[in-house]
Each structure stands twice: as structure tokens, then as C-alpha cells.
């Protein structure tokens, strides 16, 4: 099984998809219902909240309230530090500045306009 797409549910499809198009540096046709952006072998999709709200389900094993629209997207890049100024120029607020993790990854995290966490990482000591 391979990841084909990570889809985000939002009230502002064009706005959130536009942010990711600028982040990834790819052109895309925007509309208010559904947008898909190719991001390497997988894609990032955006759909309107009213389109998916009836598909929500409870998670009885969760220790507390379930946030039904939360995700973290991981984007692998060659050099985290080289991406930092470009992404900063998009006006993001950093949750974690470029940091080397104990397991060797170099990563930085921020929230997109809808509040989702975005992790941009590189694996300096690994070949992928």
C-alpha cells in the first residue's frame, strides 16, 4: 500500500490550496470545491468541508476529544536551511525553527492558514 494523497478538509479550498501551490512552487487551477496538487509521487488534495462533514465518525479508543480535521504533513527536501528563508517569506509563523532531531533528521515546523502542522525535513545522513 502506497500513500496516494493527503487530503485536507477546509472552508476555503482556493485559499488553502493557493498557499500550498506557492509553498511547493507549482501552478494549479483553483476552485472552491476540490483541488489536487501533485507533490512528488503523492498529491495533496483539498475538499470543501460541506462535502465531507457527513463522513465523520467517532474514535472510541481516543484518550480525549478527537479533532476531526487535524493532520501533519511531512515534506522531504534536500536542505531544510535553504528552504527556511523562502518559506518564511510566505508569512508563516514558525512552531519549530530548523532543528536537528535526536534521530538525525533536520526539520522545521509551521502551521498553514487552516492551522494544520507542516513539517519540512531533510535526512542528511540517509540516502532516500
Positions of PLM-derived features:
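N-terminal amphipathic/basic helix or basic patch
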Residues: 1, 11, 15-18
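Vicinal oxygen chelate
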Residues: 1-4, 25-75, 84-111, 122-128
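Generic structural signal for individual residues within well-ordered alpha-helical segments
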Residues: 7, 17, 81-85
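Conserved beta-strand-loop-alpha-helix junction that forms the acyl-donor binding cleft
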Residues: 7-12, 102
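Helix N-cap motif at beta-to-alpha junctions
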Residues: 12-13, 78-80
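Conserved active-site tyrosine of GNAT-family acetyltransferases
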Residues: 16-21, 87, 115
Amino acid at each position: 500500500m502506497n500513500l496516494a494523497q493527503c487530503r485536507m478538509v477546509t472552508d476555503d479550498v482556493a485559499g488553502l490550496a493557493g498557499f500550498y501551490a506557492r509553498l511547493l512552487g507549482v501552478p494549479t487551477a483553483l476552485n472552491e470545491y476540490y483541488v489536487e496538487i501533485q507533490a512528488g509521487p503523492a498529491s495533496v488534495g483539498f475538499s470543501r468541508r460541506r462535502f465531507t462533514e457527513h463522513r465523520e465518525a467517532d474514535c472510541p479508543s481516543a484518550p480525549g476529544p478527537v479533532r476531526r480535521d487535524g493532520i501533519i504533513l511531512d515534506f522531504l527536501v534536500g536542505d531544510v536551511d535553504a528552504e527556511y528563508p523562502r518559506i518564511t517569506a510566505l508569512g508563516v509563523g514558525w512552531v519549530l525553527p530548523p532543528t536537528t532531531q535526536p534521530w538525525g533528521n533536520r526539520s522545521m515546523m509551521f502551521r498553514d492558514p487552516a492551522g494544520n502542522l507542516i513539517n519540512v525535513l531533510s535526512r542528511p545522513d540517509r540516502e532516500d
